[in-house]
């Protein structure tokens, strides 16, 4: 019974080690890592590799009702079928030769800049889209007819109605823009000049006069990079609706020592029409606040992620209080990292109702404004809810004056839990895009994040509460490569109706399903360990989880991922595909061999056991100079007869132990190998010794070299060994007698005889092909 006790202790030790690895941040590693080839082979990705004369598939518009994805690119607008993006329509919208030549004469790149890059693509009404492009540094806009119904199959450009795109689309295709079309009015954050210096938030189209932010005032906007724009209701009264812009900009003078970038959220009232005597045709309700995304550090020194890259609003039950997800990266060139922070709109509104930023004191630093704030409070929308003013043109002069000089709030907006929910550092990529799906699971609702990177991969991450629903744990489920070549992901859309994810980049468009339950495995434990809210064990396979379906055999544990509790009553026999793979490997004595075993899950802890021939006892393999352990398996050096036996590869994850592989290693001694090599074609080994004695010198040379090669215990001297063989060969060639004209005729007949013998014995002297 002693050996049984030792095995039990060994298993408990492995379990404790596995749990320790989890506590040390093992969840930060993707459980599954799928290459582009694996995604293709498993039919989990569909790619549109773009057209030869187009690129920059960055502008997305998702239409769930028509089951279409509209994409703006270079000189083209596409309409993709949501079921399969291989089915698409296209509109060609290039610039004229005159515009292109003018752009070229202005010193711009004719291929990368002097084209019509689509920057704005919005739904205008039930039958038309509104599109704007850079127009080779001459912005232009028009309408696209899509018909009343999806079956109309209409997708064409309104060639008779082109508009000036200034204040709607940037001139430079490299500049970011954010836009929103509401009730026939276009809200845009963009640059309004050729040089890309006059940045503003505009409202154009519609029946009202265009309106914008204050010009040439860094307190309002300081070289911003616009990310996105969203309409969010403040109350049940539509007059209180506000448009929020997310952007990053240079820090205001005095706000930070040295040059720095800050992430911002800006607000404007939808019913803002500018002032009467001051701020005419300018926003009177514009306010902005800083978005903080940082990791708390010792002594109050935080690590900040200030480069806002993307924003996603998760609307659920209350449209007035969506959850804001923001993707951030670091500004430092030394420390590169990415993070996802989550914000509540109640915190945002609290900041906009807080103190204004004001410069005062001997050092003229930014301090909270302590004076009297005029009524109605600047930033409040004119409505019956919060005042009694019918229009911003009726606001008192002191309100307009205060709003003009105090556009920034003093307090920043901190993320929920005061820290990011996802952090990635020390990796070869940074986050660029994010979309989020709220999924119903057996034990609650979970937000599943799909995060795009600058190398063309998508991370699937779920936030799981630990002790409470506010203390979240980051679990990285999958890392998927969706493009053949590394390229930055610049656009993402998620279709809950089709359960598909759509991704855009410079190279093309990709489509992949939100869930791939079958890839997790064919056992209940494997499905439970995945902790994927989309998937559950249905009694026979890991399949899509539907909350409405009632099955007693359904097994799912997202919060803990504990297969020992949920799958302990299930016995997985061979027909469930749970039996380990078996292999037989032959190795040569004194040589090296490699036993390959890598689990599907990158979070699993792998350990090996060895079982000698005709023995039941198994012992754990210890790593030493003889056995080297790698992520891919075991390397056994200088094999001996005692190494023959069974090698068992086990994977431990979250307390669950699974045998992945059983390798039977047969070590062949050198004498036996010599007999095998010298057997004749008839399989008669009795002539082995006679054949060895009759070998020519050249045969013995290659045989000696071969045996020395396979028997050489030190792999590091392989180059030295080859060098010795080459030196000997060169030395033998130099020692051959030279041919002189005087004795050439004398030895001519001997040379001819030698040629004949060489022809007859050539095949015999060649090394066997099996070698």
Curated annotation (Swiss-Prot):
One of its GO terms (biological process) is sympathetic neuron projection extension. Residues 580-664 form the Ig-like C2-type domain. Residues 1-20 form the signal peptide. Gene3D superfamilies: Immunoglobulins, ligand-binding face of the semaphorins, domain 2, YVTN repeat-like/Quinoprotein amine dehydrogenase. Glycans are attached at residues 53, 125, 590. It holds the Pfam family Sema. Changing residue 396 to S: Found in a renal cell carcinoma sample; somatic mutation. Changing residue 131 to T: In a breast cancer sample; somatic mutation. SUPFAM superfamilies: Immunoglobulin, Plexin repeat, Sema domain. Residues 31-514 form the Sema domain. Belongs to the semaphorin family. Interacts with PLXND1. Strong binding to neuropilin is mediated by the carboxy third of the protein. This is Semaphorin-3A. It comes from Homo sapiens.
């Amino acid at each position: 019974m002693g050996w049984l006790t030792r095995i039990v202790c060994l298993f408990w030790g492995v379990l404790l080690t596995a749990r320790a690895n989890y506590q040390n941040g093992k969840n930060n590693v993707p459980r599954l890592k799928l290459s582009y080839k694996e995604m293709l082979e498993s039919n989990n990705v569909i790619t549109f590799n773009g057209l030869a004369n187009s690129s920059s598939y960055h502008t997305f518009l998702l239409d769930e009702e028509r089951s279409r994805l509209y994409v703006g690119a270079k000189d083209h607008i596409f309409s993709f079928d949501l079921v399969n993006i291989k089915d698409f329509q296209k509109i060609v919208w290039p610039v004229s030769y005159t515009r292109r030549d003018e752009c070229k004469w202005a010193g711009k790149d004719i291929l990368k800049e002097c084209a019509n890059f689509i920057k704005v693509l919005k739904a205008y009404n039930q039958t038309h889209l509104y599109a704007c492009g850079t127009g080779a540094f001459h912005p232009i806009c028009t309408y696209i007819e899509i018909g009343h119904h999806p079956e109309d199959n209409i997708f064409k450009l309104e060639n008779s109605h082109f508009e000036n795109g200034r204040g709607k689309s940037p001139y430079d295709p490299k500049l970011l823009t954010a836009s929103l079309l509401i009730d026939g009015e276009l809200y845009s954050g963009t640059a309004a000049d050729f040089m890309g210096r006059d940045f503003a938030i505009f409202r154009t189209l519609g029946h009202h006069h265009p309106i914008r932010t204050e010009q040439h005032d860094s307190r309002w906007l300081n070289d911003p990079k616009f990310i996105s724009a969203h309409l969010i209701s403040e109350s049940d009264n539509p007059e209180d609706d506000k448009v929020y812009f997310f952007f990053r900009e240079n820090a205001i003078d005095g706000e930070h020592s040295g040059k720095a970038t800050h992430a911002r959220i800006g607000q404007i009232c939808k019913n803002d029409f500018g002032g009467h005597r001051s701020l005419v045709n300018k926003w009177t309700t514009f306010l902005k606040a800083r978005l903080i995304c940082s990791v708390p550090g010792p002594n109050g020194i935080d690590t900040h992620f200030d480069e806002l890259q993307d924003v996603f609003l998760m609307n659920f039950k209350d449209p007035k209080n969506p959850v804001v997800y923001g993707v951030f990266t670091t500004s430092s060139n030394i420390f590169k990292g990415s993070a996802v922070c989550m914000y509540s709109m109640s915190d945002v509104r609290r900041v906009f109702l807080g103190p204004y930023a004001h410069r005062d004191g001997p050092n003229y630093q930014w301090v909270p404004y302590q004076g009297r704030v005029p009524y109605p409070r600047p930033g409040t929308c004119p409505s019956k809810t919060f005042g009694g003013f019918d229009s911003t043109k009726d606001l008192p002069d002191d309100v307009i004056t205060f709003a003009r000089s105090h556009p920034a709030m003093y307090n920043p907006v901190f993320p929920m839990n005061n820290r990011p929910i996802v952090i990635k550092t020390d990796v070869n990529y940074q986050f660029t895009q994010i979309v989020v799906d709220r999924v119903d699971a057996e034990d609650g609702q979970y937000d599943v994040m799909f995060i795009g990177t600058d190398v063309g991969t998508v991370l699937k991450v779920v936030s799981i509460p630990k002790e409470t629903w506010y203390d979240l744990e980051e679990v990285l489920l999958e890392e998927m490569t969706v493009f053949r070549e590394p390229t930055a992901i610049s656009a993402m859309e998620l279709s809950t109706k089709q359960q598909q994810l759509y991704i855009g980049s410079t190279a093309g468009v990709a489509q992949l399903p939100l869930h791939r339950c079958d890839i997790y495995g064919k056992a209940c434990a494997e499905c439970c360990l995945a902790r994927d809210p989309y998937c559950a064990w249905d009694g026979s396979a890991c399949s899509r989880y539907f909350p409405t379906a009632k099955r007693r055999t359904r097994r799912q544990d997202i919060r803990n991922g504990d297969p020992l509790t949920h799958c302990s009553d299930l016995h997985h026999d061979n027909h469930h595909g749970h039996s380990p793979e078996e292999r037989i490997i032959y190795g040569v004595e004194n040589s090296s061999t490699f036993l390959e075993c890598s689990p599907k899950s990158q979070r699993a802890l792998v350990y090996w056991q060895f079982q000698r021939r005709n023995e039941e006892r198994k012992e754990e393999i210890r790593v030493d100079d003889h056995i080297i352990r790698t992520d891919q398996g075991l390397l056994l050096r200088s094999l001996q007869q005692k190494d023959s036996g069974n090698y068992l590869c086990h994977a431990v994850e979250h307390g669950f132990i699974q045998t992945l592989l059983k390798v039977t290693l047969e070590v062949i001694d050198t004498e036996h190998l010599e007999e095998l090599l010298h057997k004749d074609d008839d399989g008669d080994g009795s002539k082995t010794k006679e054949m060895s004695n009759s070998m020519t010198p050249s045969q013995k040379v290659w045989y000696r070299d071969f045996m020395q090669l396979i028997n050489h215990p030190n792999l590091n001297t392989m180059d030295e060994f080859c060098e010795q063989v080459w030196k000997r060969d060169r030395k033998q060639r130099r020692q051959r007698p030279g041919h002189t004209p005087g004795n050439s005729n004398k030895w001519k007949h001997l040379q001819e005889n030698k040629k004949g013998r060489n022809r007859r014995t050539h095949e015999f002297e060649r090394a066997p092909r099996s070698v």
